[in-house]
UniProtKB/Swiss-Prot annotation:
Transmembrane segments: none annotated. It comes from the Bacteria. Keywords: Cytoplasm, Glycosyltransferase, Purine salvage, Transferase. One of its GO terms (cellular component) is cytoplasm. Disulfide bonds: none annotated. The gene is apt. Its EC number is 2.4.2.7. Catalyzes a salvage reaction resulting in the formation of AMP, that is energically less costly than de novo synthesis. It comes from Roseiflexus castenholzii (strain DSM 13941 / HLO8). This is Adenine phosphoribosyltransferase. GO terms for molecular function: adenine binding; adenine phosphoribosyltransferase activity; AMP binding. CDD domains: PRTases_typeI (cd06223). Homodimer. The lineage of its organism: Bacteria, Bacillati, Chloroflexota, Chloroflexia, Chloroflexales.
Amino acid sequence: MTINLTDLIRNVPDFPVPGIQFKDITPLLQHGAAFKQVIDTLAARYEGRSLDAVVGVESRGFIFSAPLAYRLGIGLVPIRKPGKLPWETFAVEYDLEYGSNKLEMHRDALDPGARVVVIDDVLATGGTVAAACQLVETAGAVVEEVACLIELTLLKGRERLANYSFFSMLQY
C-alpha cells in the first residue's frame, strides 16, 4: 500500500522567522511505514548505480542519508556546520532562505573520482545543496545526483542546481 506522503507534512507558518512557511517532516518520520516508503523509494532509485558514498547535509539530510547508505552498503559522508567536524576540512559559505551560513566536510572524506548522491530534506533556494555539491567537487568527487524529500518550487532552487541531475519526492 502506498502512503500519501503529503498528508504527513505539516505546514508551520512564520518558522523559524516571520514570512517562512516551514515544512515540518516530523509527522512523516513518526509514521514508520511512511519513513520506510521514503527510504525504499530512494534505495530503488540508486541501487545498481555504482555509487561510492551517500553525502548527507546537516542536519535533517542525515535522517535520510544514513539509512540509504546502509541499504546501498556504501559509506556515509556528513556535511556539517562549522566547528562540528574534528579533522581538517574543506569549507564553503553560502546564502540560504533566511540568512547565510557555512558548511564543512572532512578533506579525506571522499577519494578523487568518487561518485556520490547528495541528500537533503528540503530544497528551498538551493543554496545549501549547491554548497554541499561544491564541497564534494572540491574533494575531486562527482555528484551523480542530488535528492531531496521536498522541493519548494516557488523558490526555484532547482535553477541553482542546473548542472546536476535532481530528484525530489514531493513538490510544493
